[in-house]
Amino acid sequence: MQMRIAFLIMAHDKPQQLLRLVQALDCAQASFHIHIDRKVDQSPFLELLGNRANVHFLSDRVVANWMGFSLVEATLRMLAQAAAHGFDYCVLLSGSDYPIKSRADLIAFFERADKEYIAFWRLEDRPSWKHKVQHYFPIDAIPIRNYSSNREPIYWRRLFWGRFFKYRKHLPKRRFLKGLVAYGGPDWWSLSYRCVEYVLNYVKDNPGYKRFYKYTSSPGEMFFQTIILNSEWARRVENFDNYGNWSAARAAHRIVSDGDMLPDEDFNYRYVDWSGETSAARETPAILDERDWESLCNSRSHFARKFDPLRSASLLHRIDRELLGISQ
């Protein structure tokens, strides 16, 4: 039976870039389940991709807020739609991602795959993340993006979040969910059908879990990791044992900082440049360009991000030509 890959894509702008991403991945084994932020007009995306039989736009869209639970809700809806159509593996992407391995290479990889490709860490191993679950964050009610900017027109947003972060340490802390260990990790992952089935059933059977994460910070970077890593699926996660050894070594040496984390790329096969966290030379994460060519060529990853259609134009053409075998 042919390997079936469902690509789940969250996008909010740049319809032509989304078209290019779909074209780079499109093949007989692929289906696409796309969520377009409800804040934007979906018609430009439908005009470009709506007539493709294997492209399915989510009809019950959500207003997607950066760092909000709305992003988890959009992902859950895409997962449910993809599961109804059937797949062997699903791959979660953003509209600013792009493959750096050919379609043939991706299919060959997933035909042999027997793991869950999701990067993770225990919040105990990354203490700077603990606040994300220790306080109530009403991000979907009061969007947090750019709240401190002088261009922010809604004064009460600046006031609320400014006061929140100033006095947060004095607020009572939430108790984490009983019987679970808190995990985090990047949004972007590749999961098998049976693992996704488990996740969807867990969410349905445990409504309190969803309620808890609705008021956390960046739940999309914790929600799925915590379900999977607290289940029998944990041992199927790529590099699970390596993480355990690394974590034990840190504990033995009483290391409690965020430094020297294992590379996410070793778990989820996604290339992202975070050098901007320690240098002002690039954004966080970096918009990739020709400077990144050698790193992409040497990467084991399947996908990279972020790409911009203008700033990454030369790099994208080179990826098409030399890595994906797509003629111009």
Model-derived regions, located:
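ER/Golgi luminal nucleotide-sugar-dependent glycosyltransferases, focusing on the catalytic module
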Residues: 1-328
